[in-house]
Amino acid sequence: MKAIYKYLVLPIILGMGVFTTVSCEKLETTNEDPNNPVEVPSNMLMSGTQKRMMDNVYDNWFGARQCLTYSQYWAQRNYTEEDRYQIRESVNNGYFNIFYRCLYCMDRLIELNTDPTKATISAVYGNNKNQIAAAKIMKVWMLSIITDTWGNVPYTEAGKLTKDVYYAKYDNQKDIYAAMIKELTEASQMINVKEKAFTGGDIIYKGDASKWKKFANSLRCRLAIHLSKVDSNWKTYIAEALKDGVFESNADNAVFKYSTTGQEYCMFYSGYYVSGRNDFTITRPFMDILKGQADTLNKKSHPWAGVVDPRLTVYTTPRIKEEKKGNVVVRTDTLYIGIPFGIPSGNNMFSTFRNMAPNWYANPPIQLTQDFTVPIMTYADLQFILSEYKGFSADEYKEGVRASVTYWTTLNGKPISTANLDAYVDAVSKKVDAEAVALQKYIDLFMNGTEAWVEIRRTGYPDQLIRPGEISAIGKDGAVLKFEPLSDTKGLIIPRVKYPTNESTLNGANFNAAVSKLEGGTNNYYSKMYWDVRTGPYDHPANK
């Protein structure tokens, strides 16, 4: 435990500014007790870093207050500042730092399997090349979240203290994407599927090298589709990944299952029941999508009007209503009403809307269970990517819908019947086009807020989400309540997160150079990602 603490908790110098005066190399010489080795075994480093990644990407801060609200799955019940794009600087600084620590740990795992003085020991825990490949894959997954949140970020010079790089430059996002696809290609090609990746410590795939290979190539497809509006080679990247082997069913899903053991709870659960807070509920826009309802306030239609999604009762519980009839209290649980998105928490109607929405603390859905399985990337996600790759093909689209509904209803312990699944697939497949694929992908990506937010920015869908300036609700007095962000996003669902303020002092010159490349030369929320070419809130750019 001491060793894991060293890598995952103690501050690490990342080459982006000095966070501490003690290096990891010096820490390694502070304890020579053979019964308490300072060197972390590679299997423990993998398990510890996997958990740290999941704990911070799928949590009630970066995960819930940012990505899940940016994607309008969740909204806050108490303080709605983050819903309205006012981000706490301490949180922004903290997650930027934590995510880079995770990258460092994967670099360290690679070193443990390449350094001749350490590789022999690491081989006890799995094939060296397979361990390296798994570390590369996890590093790319984490890096993709970093760059898709902030844009241009340190990469090639990050974590290079031993090479006397104390302040890392910010790489262009275009170059980072090219590097990530290259890393995944190399990872896939070095995997020996006949040998274990890890004999223990791999929470995601239990050491199954064949599944790591499929994940590497499926993730290549995801990154390639991100580039569909800006890189004419995106189809080539996918074709090459398909040749190397991708997910074939839900059995290949990259997921992280938490435990019911004390400190191993899912962070969504901990944020509610360990911390004793009741902070979130489902949004009205997402609830309307699931219920097949049009947005009458903003005159937006629904492509599957009247079709209730079978995942509705998985993703949320209803609001429990109690009514007294005579001397008997009758409870009804059929009220599925989402909370209006982006209303100021100080508005005198806010408590009314909150009390109409589901109370997840009292009646928790599956994502608030102790051992919830968080989705990293799924077979359904891949099928929607392949549908788009094939010109929005119906076969892959339908397979994606089937896989998603089957996965979520099975995870919830109530698998959908074949007849009901067939009926739903038929109802949502009358017209398969860019909107249908994007909307079903959005529904599937619930709880994967980072990827859903990417897709919203890349495609401009779903149209049903509330844009700045649109009507969120109308009060009983007829007052119109609009979604009015606290930060300027030029009328768009938030395109990026500002660079953390710590970077301006710890890595000032490189920070300033990065800011100068943003729109208007300021550290803002409205500068777009390299792959985001939308020209307006309802623009749906064509693929190259």
Where are these regions (language model features)?
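Membrane-proximal, proline-rich intrinsically disordered regions
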Residues: 24-72, 76-85, 97-100, 108, ...
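Long, intrinsically disordered, low-complexity segments
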Residues: 23, 266-306, 312, 423-544
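Hydrophobic-face positions in mid-chain alpha helices that act as interaction patches
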Residues: 234-386, 390-444, 448-450, 459
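Internal, well-ordered domain-core segments that constitute the primary functional module
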Residues: 178-249
